[in-house]
C-alpha cells in the first residue's frame, strides 16, 4: 500500500437542515373537512352501554387475576385495551374471550 492509500478520507460534510417554516405555513393553509376525513370503509359505532363497560371491567379484572398482575388503574386500562383490540381484530369473539379469560389461559 502506498502512503496516499493509507491516508484516511475526510468524512462527508453534513448538510445543513433547511428552514422548516415553509412546511409549517403549508400545513396551516391545508383545509380539512369532515367529508375528506370519512372513508367509504368508515363505520359508525354506537357508544358502549353501561352493561358493556361493566362486562369489560369484569373481564379485565379476571384477566389480571389469572395472570397474577396487581390490579392498578393502569393495569386495568391496559387489560381493557387488550381485550377490545383482540375482539376488534377478530382474534377472539366475545364468547370465546369470556371463556378463555374466566377459565384461565
Curated annotation (Swiss-Prot):
Residues 1-48 are annotated as: Disordered. Keywords: Cytoplasm, ERV, mRNA transport, Nucleus, RNA-binding, Transport, Transposable element. Coiled coil: none annotated. It is found in: Cytoplasm; Nucleus, Nucleolus. Retroviral replication requires the nuclear export and translation of unspliced, singly-spliced and multiply-spliced derivatives of the initial genomic transcript. Rec interacts with a highly structured RNA element (RcRE) present in the viral 3'LTR and recruits the cellular nuclear export machinery. This permits export to the cytoplasm of unspliced genomic or incompletely spliced subgenomic viral transcripts. Despite functional similarity, Rec shares almost no sequence homology with HIV-1 Rev and HTLV-1 Rex. This is Endogenous retrovirus group K member 8 Rec protein. It comes from Homo sapiens (Human).
Amino acid at each position: 500500500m502506498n502512503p496516499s492509500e493509507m491516508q484516511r478520507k475526510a468524512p462527508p460534510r453534513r448538510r445543513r437542515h433547511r428552514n422548516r417554516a415553509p412546511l409549517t405555513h403549508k400545513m396551516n393553509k391545508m383545509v380539512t373537512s369532515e367529508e375528506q376525513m370519512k372513508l367509504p370503509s368508515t363505520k359508525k359505532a354506537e357508544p358502549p352501554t353501561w352493561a358493556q363497560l361493566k362486562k369489560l371491567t369484569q373481564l379485565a379484572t379476571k384477566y389480571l387475576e389469572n395472570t397474577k398482575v396487581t390490579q392498578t388503574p393502569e393495569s386495568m386500562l391496559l387489560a381493557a385495551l387488550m381485550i377490545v383490540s383482540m375482539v376488534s381484530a377478530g382474534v377472539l369473539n366475545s364468547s370465546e374471550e369470556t371463556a378463555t379469560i374466566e377459565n384461565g389461559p
